[in-house]
Amino acid sequence: MQKPELLAPGGSLEKLKTAIDYGADAVYIGGEAFSLRVAAENFSKEDMIEGLKYAHDRGKKVYLTANILPHNSDIDEFEKFIKEIRPMGFDAVLIADLGLFDMMRSLAPEIPIHVSTQANNINYRSAIAWHKMGATRVVLAREMSFKEIAEFREKIPADLELEAFIHGAMCISYSGRCLLSNYMTGRDSNQGACAHPCRWNYKLVEETRPGEYMDVFENERGTFIFNSKDLCTIEHIPELVQSGITSLKIEGRVKTSYYVATIVGAYRREIDRYFADPQNYTFNKAEYDELCKVSHRPYTTGFYFGKPDENSQVYTSSSYIRDYDLIGIVQSYDAETGIATITQRTRFCKGDEIEIIRPMQPYFVQTVDSMTDENGSEIEVANHAEQIIKMKVTEPVTAGSMLRKKK
């Protein structure tokens, strides 16, 4: 039984490093063009080079997303893009469009191509066709069940890898192919600029009664009729593995480093726990609780156990659940004194009970007994943005460890 790859989002160089530090086997990133995430910080050429070195030095992989649905005006620029990224050493490029796929095969035949979920990979015949053209992996559409994926795996070539989303936001449209944003805001979702109108509040208007807004659902705020819950499959690692998925993908290139650290860490531990003893494996609910400590919508298993029902949507609000705040990030740690140097992110005080998450280790809880500013003067509260503070911690930490506090 092959251990699947844990694939994490890297919306910036910092997030790429965080994902790798917290246990990702591979990270997918976007450049400043063609990557379908305008809202992400994305990578300059210099960032790409540094990120690739950071990953490869640690035996990890980096995939480059180039999965927009291009117009004629994009083609010449894409050729320049290929020539620029070709020598960098990416482990694969994600493509959704057949024309861009053909250009990649012609101009950089040595770079593996993964076919993006934007290509609606929902049946095995499509996958076989992509494989014949040279694809090494297809990213499955989110609209597939475990049963369908297992059948898919059986009917495709053994060397064709399967990647599937296991956690994160769900699009109401078919694997991200949506024109609501284009129609309502002029922002092209298939060029990476989606305004997420599926999360907006809607009411009903009857043609002969202009100006009379009626609730679609019995709620004074209207209803959020397109508003999906977030995907979460951490309770189903055995099913994910047994269905034949090669790479388990976490959504979220526009999420924070804290989000990436928490989600990657939880899935890393649960995957490793399963493979340590598959026969006697039982799910550790503490990891689900960990996933609830980031900003998220209520969770669902999506299509994995069949078509979603009314319980897969959130009808009354598009707000996130935010029960914890990131309050600081460890920059360095002195093992002799037990003192951590921390960059403050959110206000916290002496006497607060906090949790500290660490790369590849369990989190721990402690009380802030004392802290000083960078000059060594004792302080009662860390309330200045990006303030450097020093604090004794009760267990060893490393650079990149994060402090959080329940609201």
Language-model features and meaning:
Residues 1-22, 26-29, 33, 51-52, ...:
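Surface-exposed amphipathic alpha-helical tracts and adjacent flexible/coil segments at the periphery
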Residues 37-54:
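Glycine-rich, positively charged N-terminal anion/phosphate-binding segment
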Residues 64-65, 95, 115-117:
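Short beta-strand elements of ligand-binding domains
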Residues 76, 110-111, 115-122:
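Gly/Gly-Pro- and Ser/Thr-rich, intrinsically disordered tail segments characteristic of DNA damage-repair
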Residues 99-100:
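Alpha-helix capping/helix-boundary segments
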Residues 104:
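RNase H-like DDE/DDD metal-dependent nuclease/strand-transfer catalytic core used by mobile genetic elements
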